[in-house]
């Protein structure tokens, strides 16, 4: 592999590493907010899950994915995983309250 190829490959990897770090930071911020939502729901005896909100989120995310040339099914799978974690956390908060 030539030095130019190695350098370009390294640049790609650096970009991916930066994006991965940003994703982790964004997820951390998202979960900080959903923790607050979980406590709010527990204090006001609201259910941990909101199917209407989840459906709206999925529909919106699919639109964003399509507009960004990202497979909407892939984006939906990621969001569903995140939503499941949030609901699990909200249920734990509810049980602790």
PLM regions with names:
Residues 1-97:
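Domain-level signature for soluble enzymes in the chorismate/prephenate branch of the shikimate pathway
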């Amino acid at each position: 592999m030539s030095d130019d190829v190695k350098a370009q490959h390294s640049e790609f990897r650096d970009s991916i590493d930066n994006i991965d770090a940003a994703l982790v930071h964004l997820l951390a911020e998202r979960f900080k907010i959903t923790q607050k939502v979980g406590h709010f729901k527990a204090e006001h005896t609201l259910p941990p899950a909101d199917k209407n909100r989840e459906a709206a989120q999925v529909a919106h995310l699919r639109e964003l994915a399509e507009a960004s040339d990202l497979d909407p099914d892939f984006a939906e799978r990621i969001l569903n995983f995140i939503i499941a974690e949030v609901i699990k956390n909200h249920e734990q908060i509810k049980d602790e309250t």
